[in-house]
Structure formats: C-alpha cells, structure tokens
C-alpha cells in the first residue's frame, strides 16, 4: 500500500481527532472540521461493529505515526515477541522511530518533514549520519541536526512551534545547539488518551 499523499485534514476528519499531520501554525479547528467525516455529508451512519471499532483504532494509530500497513503489521509482530504488554510495546516501538523522535524534539514541524530531513542526511545519531526514518532510537542516543542544516528556516520555525506542545519526559533538547537526548523508553501514559491500543491487540489476535 502506497503512502497517502492526499489532504492531511481528510485523515484527521476520518479519525475525528487531530493526528498532528499539519504543522500547527494554525489551530486544527480553524481549517479542518474534524467532526465531519469525509464523504458522509452528515447522513446518519449505521451501527459500527466491534471489528469496525478495532479497525478504526488501528487506522488512527497507524496514521498518527504515518506508517504503512505492512510496516504497522511488522511492528505488531515484533511487539508481540517482546516481554510485557503487546500494546505498550507496539506504542514504544512506534515512538522510538527516528522520524518520530526528530519530530518530538522539535526539529521538524511534522513527521513527514522529519522523514524528509532524515532522508536528506540532515540528522545525526551519536555523531553518525542516519538516513533511515524507521531507525529505532535507543535510550542514551543523541540526536543532532547536522551543522550544514542548522541554518534552515524550517527547522528554526519548527523549534518555535514545538514550544507550544506539551513537553515529553523521555527526551531532553538543547534548542540552541539543536541536539537532543533520548533519555529512556517512552511512557505510554503520556501518549494521546484516544489511543485504546487494546483494540488493536484484539484485532490482530483474531
């Protein structure tokens, strides 16, 4: 399945929540009517089945992290092999993707922009160039914007926008040096309350 290249607002409307796919320069509700599901024209929908609810939750989380269907399925398989809660493991794996960490640290306004920076070799991990967006960041890893990219206006703008977001406990950022440390495994309790990951586990357990 190819990556979705259509209107980002449409995806947020489909899931009835802000998937943080836009830069955040303007409030999401100023440009996107989240309550209106695309293509429905306000007509009443039929009763949603348990499977439908589970599928929607999977789609919401998959779109939030902007990963493809096959990637998401592989993350679930990996999470299921690890010790502990499969659902929590899944979210930790997704949160530890390099593109997500770059976004969380404020070096990019969106995860899509973070992927672009990584692909263009503008990001260092422990002093080495890493151009794989799905690279799994480990506790203690230091993420840095490459010297030649530090003057980019979009990165400076992203850092300003990041100040408006709630701080994340598992990362530490030096905005002046454009470096950050991935201190520890993500705390799933700090992730969006809408994420009912147990529904995803139920879906894949069938």
Curated annotation (Swiss-Prot):
Short name of one Pfam family: S4
Domain S4 RNA-binding span(s) in chain numbering: 96-158
InterPro entries cross-referenced by the UniProt entry: Ribosomal_uS4, Ribosomal_uS4_bac-type, Ribosomal_uS4_CS, Ribosomal_uS4_N, S4_RNA-bd, S4_RNA-bd_sf
CDD domains xref list: S4
Keyword Thylakoid annotated: no
GO cellular component: small ribosomal subunit
Gene Ontology process terms (BP): ribosomal small subunit biogenesis; translation
Keyword vocabulary terms for this entry: Ribonucleoprotein, Ribosomal protein, RNA-binding, rRNA-binding
The keyword Repeat is assigned to this record: no
A GO MF label: structural constituent of ribosome
Function noted in UniProt: One of the primary rRNA binding proteins, it binds directly to 16S rRNA where it nucleates assembly of the body of the 30S subunit. With S5 and S12 plays an important role in translational accuracy.
Subunit-structure text: Part of the 30S ribosomal subunit. Contacts protein S5. The interaction surface between S4 and S5 is involved in control of translational fidelity.
Family: Belongs to the universal ribosomal protein uS4 family.
Protein name: Small ribosomal subunit protein uS4
Taxonomic lineage from the root: Bacteria, Pseudomonadati, Pseudomonadota, Gammaproteobacteria, Legionellales
